[in-house]
């Protein structure tokens, strides 16, 4: 908490903010001005920032004469100054309020700030190329760079080599035990757990060795057409386990999908799954389960699908994963 009334105060406040380890900033305008120093604070702060402002509290007892406490015009001037400086800041739809209202605005800013910070510290690791004819999974990397997201594109062959190099890894038995405990009655193919554990360790080691200076990682991986025949399994279960660890994994080298999953994870503080618009709803299902219960026509509905990255937390039966 600091009062900024001059450019010198701004520098001092910025140092205090850095010492405190803050990675997001809310600039609260308690009265009109000073727009230059307050917007300079936002300019020089390296992280997500928002602006809110005080509203008048009462007209009684000279509240609008000697008791002014409003920053309505100050917010207007500050927003103009931010634009002049090309400073991007979050301003709520109605950014002026009393203490409780401003606190609510700050609370609403938290997931936004988390998403911005996380994207600034994200690397997407892909293993491709995407399957033939899956043009929907095309992902020009320019837009990732525009979001300050790093990407490392790898060959599926590189991943296969790393997987083979992890054969007999001493950590495999412990991972198998963890999988057995997690799957319970859903452990329908115990004979492949060793390979799945080997693959999970391969990915985690790859992340550790390749994340570089980035704090977070998401993966866009491949699961077909040659994956199953060459690796000897499908990776869905491992992908779901990584997703539960906070490392979202998308299929079909869907890089933008991995980015979407990552944002969802950060904003929700929870594991996410990616649901594709896949196919139409059959007339009989519509008649039995939707018509009369919801205000939708058949043409308003669709079936969503994804091929297995939903973690066990969100399945009714382990066999569904």
Please name every model-derived segment.
Residues 314-321:
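Conserved small/polar residues in nucleotide/adenosyl-binding loops
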Residues 77-95:
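Conserved thiamine diphosphate
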Residues 184-258, 264-267:
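Long, internal scaffold/assembly segments composed of regular secondary structure
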């Amino acid at each position: 908490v600091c009062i900024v009334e001059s450019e010198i105060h701004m520098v001092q406040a910025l140092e205090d903010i850095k010492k405190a380890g803050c990675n997001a900033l809310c600039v609260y305008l308690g009265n009109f001005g000073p727009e230059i120093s307050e917007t300079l604070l936002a300019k020089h702060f390296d992280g997500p920032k928002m602006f809110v402002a005080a509203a008048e509290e009462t007209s009684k007892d000279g509240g609008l004469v000697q008791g002014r406490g409003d920053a309505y015009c100050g917010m207007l001037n500050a927003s103009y100054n931010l634009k002049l400086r090309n400073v991007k800041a979050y301003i709520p739809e109605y950014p002026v309020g009393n203490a409780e209202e401003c606190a609510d605005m700050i609370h609403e800013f938290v997931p936004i700030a988390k998403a911005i910070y996380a994207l600034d510290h994200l690397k997407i690791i892909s293993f491709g190329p995407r399957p033939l004819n899956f043009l929907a999974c095309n992902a020009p990397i320019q837009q990732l760079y525009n979001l300050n997201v790093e990407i490392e594109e790898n060959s599926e062959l590189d991943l296969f080599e790393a997987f083979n190099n992890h054969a007999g890894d001493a950590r495999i038995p412990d991972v198998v035990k963890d999988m057995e405990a997690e799957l319970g009655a859903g452990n329908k193919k115990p004979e492949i757990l060793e390979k799945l554990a080997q693959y999970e360790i391969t990915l985690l080691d790859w992340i550790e060795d390749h994340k570089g200076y980035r704090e977070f990682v998401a993966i866009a991986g491949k699961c077909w057409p040659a994956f199953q025949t060459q690796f000897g399994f499908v990776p869905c279960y491992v992908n779901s386990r990584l997703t539960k660890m906070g490392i979202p994994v998308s299929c079909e080298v869907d890089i933008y999908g991995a980015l979407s999953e990552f944002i969802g994870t950060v904003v929700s503080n929870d594991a996410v799954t990616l649901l594709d618009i896949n196919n139409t709803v059959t007339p009989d299902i519509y008649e039995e389960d939707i018509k009369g219960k919801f205000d939708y026509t058949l043409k308003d509905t669709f079936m969503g699908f994804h091929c297995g990255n939903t973690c066990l937390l969100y399945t009714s039966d382990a066999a569904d994963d």
